C-alpha cells in the first residue's frame, strides 16, 4: 500500500523548511520573517516546524549550515586541493563565488546580517563562523602557499584575501540592495573576471 505523502517525505522536512526559510529571510529580513509564512511555504504546519527548530535563530543557523556553508566548503576545498598556479586559483575562486551567488541569495542574506546584527548578534556570529571566516581563511592559506612558492609578493595573506573578496561582496550587496531599488544591474561574473585580472597584476611577482 502506498504511504501518504507526509510519511514518505518526513526525512525531507528539515531541508524543505530551510529552503523556504532562506527565501523568506532573503525577502523580508530576519526580524520581519514570520515562522507561519516559512511553514506555509514549506508546506507544513507551524507545529511541525517547531518539531525541528525551537526558534527563528536556530532555523537561521540551520539555513546557513545547510544552504550556504556547503557552497563555501565546496569552494574552499577546491582551493585547498588545487596544485595549479595561483592565478588559476584566484580565477576559479572568484568565478565560483559569482556562479553560486547567482543560485543562492548570498547578497540578500549578507545584507540581512549586516542590517540586523546589532539587534540579533547571533546572526553575525553564525555568518562569521560558517561563511566569512572560512572563505577568508581558505583564501589566505592559498595566498600564503603561493608566497612560499615565490608566486605572490610579500604582504599579509589575510589582508590580501580581503582585497580579493571585497569587490565581490560589494557586488553581491549591490545586486541585493540597490538593483531592486532601480540601481543599474551588475554582471557579477564579468566583475569576477575583470577583478581577477586586475588584482593579479598587483599580487603576482
Enumerate the language-model features and the residues they cover.
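Amphipathic, non-transmembrane alpha-helical scaffold segments
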Residues: 10, 18, 64, 124-136, ...
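Hydrophobic alpha-helical connector segments
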Residues: 62, 76-110, 158-164
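Short coil/turn segments at alpha/beta junctions that flank glycine-rich nucleotide-binding fingerprints
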Residues: 27-31, 82, 149
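C-terminal alpha-helix
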Residues: 142, 198-205
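Short secondary-structure transition hinges
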Residues: 73, 99-141, 182-185
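Alpha-helical DNA-contacting segments of helix-turn-helix folds
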Residues: 61-67
Amino acid at each position: 500500500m502506498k504511504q501518504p505523502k507526509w510519511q514518505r517525505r518526513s526525512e525531507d522536512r528539515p531541508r524543505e523548511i530551510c529552503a523556504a526559510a532562506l527565501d523568506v529571510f532573503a525577502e523580508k529580513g530576519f526580524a520581519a520573517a514570520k515562522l507561519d509564512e516559512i511553514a506555509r511555504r514549506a508546506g507544513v504546519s507551524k507545529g511541525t516546524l517547531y518539531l525541528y527548530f525551537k526558534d527563528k535563530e536556530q532555523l537561521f543557523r540551520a539555513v546557513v549550515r545547510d544552504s550556504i556553508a556547503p557552497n563555501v566548503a565546496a569552494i574552499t576545498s577546491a582551493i585547498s586541493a588545487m596544485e595549479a598556479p595561483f592565478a588559476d586559483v584566484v580565477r576559479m575562486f572568484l568565478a565560483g563565488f559569482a556562479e553560486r551567488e547567482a543560485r543562492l541569495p548570498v547578497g540578500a542574506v549578507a545584507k540581512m546580517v549586516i542590517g540586523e546584527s546589532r539587534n540579533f548578534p547571533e546572526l553575525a556570529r553564525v555568518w562569521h563562523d560558517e561563511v566569512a571566516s572560512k572563505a577568508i581563511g581558505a583564501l589566505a592559506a592559498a595566498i600564503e602557499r603561493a608566497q612560499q612558492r615565490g608566486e605572490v609578493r610579500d604582504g599579509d595573506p589575510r589582508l590580501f584575501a580581503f582585497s580579493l573578496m571585497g569587490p565581490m561582496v560589494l557586488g553581491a550587496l549591490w545586486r541585493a540592495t540597490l538593483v531592486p531599488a532601480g540601481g543599474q544591474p551588475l554582471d557579477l561574473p564579468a566583475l569576477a573576471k575583470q577583478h581577477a585580472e586586475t588584482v593579479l597584476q598587483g599580487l603576482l611577482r
